[in-house]
Amino acid sequence: MAIPFNPPPESLPSQSSLEELLDFDWDTVESIADDEGWTWDDNRGAYFEGGNIVSPDRILSVTRTRMDGYQSQIRSVSNDLTSGNISVSEWERRVAEITVSVALIFFLLGMGSRSKITGDDTEDVKDRLRLQFDYLRNFSEEILNGDLTVGRLSSRAELYIFDAQNNYSLGQEATHSASEYPFYSNVLGSTMPCEQCPRETAKGIVPRGELISIGQRICLSRCYCSFWYYRTQNESQVQTLPLIGIKDGWIGVRVPLRAM
């Protein structure tokens, strides 16, 4: 039986102390697109590199590499806590800092460019982060109460960066207005998806609002799927996934990116 982790007792600082992490400037947020040499084309609603569209597979590959690094950071912070090198208060602050960083980086990636981010977009991002701060404070209190094992603590901490990464999808939704891009399709982001994600992909190009939101499926915040947006429903789907039912499971055949 796993033994609960019991840190030394302490009083947590006011949760409002995390509010200063939301005093950010988009001009200083790291741009994955700039790092990769991608340029956003507003007319096409997509990134381009060397004259070619940046495929969902390429974006996914870069995303996974980045997320591996952020997971390592979270694991290191949690290991510092369970090894007695930092307090719960210090752990909470560092997890919050990483979460904010990931959220901003991926929202910017989803938007395409800093110039497109409005004040309302910024407030939406801040509100989502404040909600994560609420969850994080409850998490910290559970740790201090000795309610969690080391393994459970570490795996649960990683969920914060996966939730933050979902800001990419939120940025994509914001930058593709429903009036200009009234249709979308699901792009599968995993070779071992939950049962819902392939089904959403197989629905094809559908009106906005007809697919289950990313982060609300069985795989929850660990979903790597994304949406691809279209001006008309008769465009070539960026990724198709024919499905053949086998008992309660599904087999999918993935088709490469098509020319747009």
Describe each model-derived feature in a short phrase.
Residues A2-R222, W228-M260:
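Domain-core detector
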